């Protein structure tokens, strides 16, 4: 039930399909609240949290699926199975940045974001090569991509002007309940005036505290 899965449920409905529901393995949706409201609730599409597909049925083509609830270890719970007669199953399995060009250039990748490891100017491990947007890490909104591209352009300008130094380096690490943090490197002798961090939490937290 990430944003793409939610949006596709609405799109299928608008195109005339009868959507039986959206299943999410986790006990919460990974999509934006507005997409849950506008894509599912407004169209009466059920959201099955803590559920996964355990069986598919059909001869020559898909005819049905079985959903089951999962426990805290994400294992199906016997006796919770639900069967649906369907002819289409869409799988929304997340996004991974396309980085074949970065690999070809020998850029160091961050295993947490599946994209390049960058500093506060969005420069990669190869001097003069910068990364931003969904080629760096997956963004929820295009507005964030545009803003990050602006910061990367400013960093590129600093590099071309020769005011960027890379002598002193520290690494930013994701702590408890944080999946990743970008940028992953800070060159402390050449920081921009403002350093913005992007991160994703591992699960929804209400009333949480951010510690740097």
Task: Give the predicted meaning of each segment.
Residues 1-212:
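Residues forming the flavin
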């Amino acid at each position: 039930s990430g944003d793409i899965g939610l949006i596709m449920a609405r799109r299928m409905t608008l195109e005339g399909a009868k959507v039986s529901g959206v299943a999410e393995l986790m006990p919460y949706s990974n999509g934006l609240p507005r997409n849950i409201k506008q894509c599912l609730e407004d169209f009466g599409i059920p959201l099955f949290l803590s559920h996964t597909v355990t069986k598919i049925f059909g001869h020559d083509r898909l005819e049905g699926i079985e959903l089951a609830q999962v426990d805290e270890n994400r294992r199906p719970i016997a006796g919770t199975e639900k069967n649906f007669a369907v002819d289409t199953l869409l799988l929304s399995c997340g996004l991974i940045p396309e980085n074949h060009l970065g690999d070809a250039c020998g850029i160091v990748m961050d295993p947490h974001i599946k994209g390049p490891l960058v500093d506060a100017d969005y420069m990669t491990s190869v001097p003069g090569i910068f990364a931003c947007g969904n080629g760096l890490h997956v963004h929820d909104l295009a507005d964030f991509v545009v803003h990050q591209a602006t910061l990367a352009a400013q960093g590129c300008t600093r590099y071309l002007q020769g005011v960027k130094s890379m002598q002193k380096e520290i690494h930013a690490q994701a702590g408890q309940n944080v999946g990743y943090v970008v940028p992953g490197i800070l060159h402390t002798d050449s920081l921009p005036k403002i350093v913005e961090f992007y991160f994703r939490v591992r699960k929804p937290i209400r009333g949480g505290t951010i510690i740097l």
